[in-house]
Amino acid sequence: MDLRTMTQSLVTLAEDNMAFFSSQGPGETARRLSNVFAGVREQALGLEPALGSLLSVAHLFDLDPETPANGYRSLVHTARCCLAHLLHKSRYVASNRRSIFFRTSHNLAELEAYLAALTQLRALAYYAQRLLATNRPGGLFFEGDEGLTADFLREYVTLHKGCFYGRCLGFQFTPSIRPFLQTISIGLVSFGEHYKRNESGLGVTASSLFTSGRFAIDPELRGAEFERITQNLDVHFWKAFWNITEIEVLSSLANMASATVRVSRLISLPPEAFEMPLTSDPKLTVTISPPLAHTGPGPVLIRLISYDLREGQDSEELNSMVKSEGPRILELRPRPQQTSRSRSLVVXFHGGGFVAQTSKSHEPYLKSWAQELGAPIISIDYSLAPEAPFPRALEECFFAYCWAVKHCALLGSTGERICLAGDSAGGNLCFTVALRAAAYGVRVPDGIMAAYPATMLQSAASPSRLLSLMDPLLPLSVLSKCVSAYAGAETEEHPNSDEKALGMMGLVRRDTSLLLRDLRLGASSWLNSFLEFSGQKSQKTSAPTVESMRRSVSEAALAQPEGPVGTDSLKILTLKDLNLKSSSETSETPEMSLSVETLGPSTPSDVNFFLRPEDAREEAEAKEGLSAKDGSSRVSNAFPEGFHPRRTSQGATQMPLYSSPIVKNPFMSPLLAPDNMLKTLPPVHIVACALDPMLDDSXMFARRLRALGQPVTLRVVEDLPHGFLSLASLCRETRQAAELCVERIRLILTPPAAAAAAAPPPL
């Protein structure tokens, strides 16, 4: 059903239902139902022209006709999903409104929630129109730190978002993944209620289980608390929540469901410099120094995963670097025979917004990759922000990559084919490590597979970024906190600075006692909250419920103790050095801890975001049409007269626009790298999500590489959220998306001659 037909059908049904409930007397429920259908009619009629104008030019921003993907298309698709749900619900109401089994309260609550969502989507459509009218031809990102980007951030903190996290949670995604998203949201708000109320991380998790019931049975309460958490809590909260999967119990359960491998070892690479041959002249070498930024030289942890035990993986030299992860488990199986070294090697960088997770979190799907690819995999445990901001993670990943290339025999590989693979933040590191390898003149990988990568860390409005208003896994406020932490804007805080003095056994005793206390408090809190919730329900007033919930959340979660002064001198010096050398006014590449003279310019003077002349004319005509409709294309004109989006009830919050020159560094935002740097990249294969707020990062990066004649492919999976690799075993759709990533890696690891022989003959 096309957009216009869907809108007309919805308007007709809304008018019919509105007339019916208007004739049902002066009752409050009938009045609210009549009003909600009147609102649906108004918003649908106002939204349809805006979506039509976006859809008419969306094809101009695709990589090619076979890859129809960009933020404009995604926004239109999301709005269509909301319209489709309202159409289905309106038909149901029209068919069952006279039945004695018609659940009036339930249907009213759902209709009101989706009406709120439709209203906010209309606001986003108007913002997308302004982006289209303001951006340069062919550009998806608004260029500049102020202007539309700053305006959108100011609007974002005032827009109501709770409707997207309650009854409408995940409506845009495939139905099979929505129960998981609901579980995550319930866990998040429960975890947030106890964050910093207890000192034991395991205790917080246990207490959250007892208080999650009321959030499960009241979607409006859950949505309001989800909105409060995403806007107010700092990056340390998100780091703690995302690291729940690191708990031994949960990681053990995940590993039980994953493939069984012969080798899974944590290896500590010593911080010792070594020599690497130059690709231009193997007789010459360059020194690869250990990571130095912020904290000085230190070891780099990598995890070696191999389905079979291969030659070199059990050598004395490698065993001397193995780091213990706990008590050894008695191996009752016969010792496996060593197989020959693989010709391939995969170097993986995990995601987590640069602030959370480790190779352990991503081990389940990496084990499957090792089995399917028949190649050893090393996953880098790089240091995380805010304790170790840029460029520490890049330095560690580059050091580990060079070490793996030099010592691939110890890893069970001959190193004939090497692939870099990563998701989200790890995808960013794939590109920047390859760029740095080319700058040093050492071997670059044979290819890159990046899943939903972040290539633009500068604050910049784009159509896909608008989706962060409703994304349950990647809200804009959370994305902003992660980027600020990686850029060094977030202050490093250590609320549990006394842990080092306790020692290992002291920590165990403390956490055990705290866990028992938390279980007692959690059970009592659950009973009290359930009784309180029941009493509030009987009064049929929603505002007191939200207010009491808001008071029940520890206010300490909104304030952080200031860290010690004078302990971060090396970190401060590094940030000052980066700020001084990353000025957008200069043409020199900012030197990092490992300086290289020939990295190229940091300001992308030869970056070309322009369309072909014929496409530019078509887009210009569309802009003229938008200006004529709106009366003006000025940024200050937010919405048409008479339309008012819903505003948040959470109070005023601040989302500062972080515009440090560091985020414009091409080793932080590879999309901003100049052409001469991007030409050094190997073949790139990107797997993106159509509904990901970072979709435009993938689309624009692929378009830049394609314009430079670089080999690049872009595959876009539908109806899945950001981070689907960590959900690979959840449903059929995520498994298929993960298999697509494996297929791209296999393509990189296949030698060109073998790939040409396996290709089908031309028709």
Swiss-Prot record:
Record PROSITE patterns: LIPASE_GDXG_HIS, LIPASE_GDXG_SER
Main location: membrane
Keyword tags: Cell membrane, Cholesterol metabolism, Cytoplasm, Hydrolase, Lipid degradation, Lipid droplet, Lipid metabolism, Membrane, Phosphoprotein, Steroid metabolism, Sterol metabolism
Region of interest called Disordered, as start-end residue ranges on this chain: 616-652
Record-level Gene Ontology MF annotations: all-trans-retinyl-palmitate hydrolase, all-trans-retinol forming activity; diacylglycerol lipase activity; monoacylglycerol lipase activity; retinyl-palmitate esterase activity; rRNA primary transcript binding; sterol ester esterase activity; triacylglycerol lipase activity
Phosphoserine PTM positions: S552, S554, S595, S627, S649
Assembly notes: Monomer and homodimer. Interacts with CAVIN1 in the adipocyte cytoplasm. Interacts with PLIN5.
Keyword hit for Secreted: no
Ranges spanned by the short sequence motif Involved in the stabilization of the negatively charged intermediate by the formation of the oxyanion hole, renumbered to the chain: 350-352
Pathway(s) this gene product operates in, as recorded in its UniProt entry: Glycerolipid metabolism; triacylglycerol degradation
Location of the protein in the cell: Cell membrane; Membrane, Caveola; Cytoplasm, Cytosol; Lipid droplet
InterPro entries in alphabetical order: AB_hydrolase_3 (IPR013094), AB_hydrolase_fold (IPR029058), HSL_N (IPR010468), Lipase_GDXG_HIS_AS (IPR002168), Lipase_GDXG_put_SER_AS (IPR033140)
Official protein name in the record: Hormone-sensitive lipase
Family: Belongs to the 'GDXG' lipolytic enzyme family.
The protein's enzyme class: hydrolase
Domain of life: Eukaryota
Organism: Ictidomys tridecemlineatus
Enzyme Commission numbers on file: 3.1.1.79, 3.1.1.23
Any one cellular-component term (Gene Ontology): cytosol
Catalysed transformations (reactions): a diacylglycerol + H2O = a monoacylglycerol + a fatty acid + H(+); a triacylglycerol + H2O = a diacylglycerol + a fatty acid + H(+); a monoacylglycerol + H2O = glycerol + a fatty acid + H(+); Hydrolyzes glycerol monoesters of long-chain fatty acids
Residue stretches of biased makeup (Basic and acidic residues): 616-627
GO BP terms in the entry: cholesterol metabolic process; diacylglycerol catabolic process; ether lipid metabolic process; lipid catabolic process; termination of RNA polymerase I transcription; transcription initiation at RNA polymerase I promoter; triglyceride catabolic process
One family name in Pfam for this protein: Abhydrolase_3
